[in-house]
């Protein structure tokens, strides 16, 4: 409930701010470097299996934002339909009847982010802004386990911080660009499978983003 109230409060702020500012819409190409690590504890033996996985992918996203003409402060919402965070397999051989290949796979679905770009200075002729954001994602598990067990999907929050620059493009008064480098740390995913095994996983994301927008 506290998470939902926080998101509603941020949405209210974005809506109120946008009524007093210039609007912008655009698309982003982002190179994501995802780092995931976790452990699975089996119910029957208590064995702990640790693992980690890195994944790199270029993923598009769309955004709409409100830009204050006086201060340059920008608040907005971005959306990614789906983001694959990779898969990993292992092969076990034991006497409990569940020997075989185990494949863990997951996606981040419906990635919504509420963010603020806060002007913080300049580097030469390039203005610099600090990005602060909150993401809401659905972790959809797509595992293929020889034991037949499944893990539930979970909704998580991610907290983003980054630096960027922006400016007008020379192709018209209404076109602009943004370049950003961001870091996101997601809440810990914890779940118990249908077979009683427990998994705990942490996820981090570093992204380099290039955006093109249109102001109106």
Predicted regions and their residues:
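Cleavable N-terminal export/targeting peptides
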Residues: 1-24
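Outer-membrane beta-barrel "beta-signal"
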Residues: 22-26, 31, 163, 169, ...
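Gram-negative (and chloroplast) outer-membrane scaffold detector with strong preference
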Residues: 60-145, 169-171, 208-214
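Periodic glycine anchor positions in long extracellular repeat architectures
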Residues: 133, 162-164
